[in-house]
């Protein structure tokens, strides 16, 4: 079952996001295994927001443990807690 994660980082900045993204090197062609969708931008309440859709919770957890968390630590960003929920419907053009 597909799985959504929403990260709201009140102290997050575009510069931090761009630094982490550059090191990850993820594009539509290199999306991590199990990744479906990744969207990021400024939060309406300030800071930075990221929304991800994964094929499963296990795929997201594997990416976190093996790739994302070590990278965020290396650029000095603490990963905020995620709001998560199962996907009922996903429409992509």
Question: Which ranges hold each PLM region?
Answer:
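Short S/T/G/P-rich N-terminal loop/turn motif that feeds into the first structured element of a domain
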Residues: 1-66, 70, 76-93
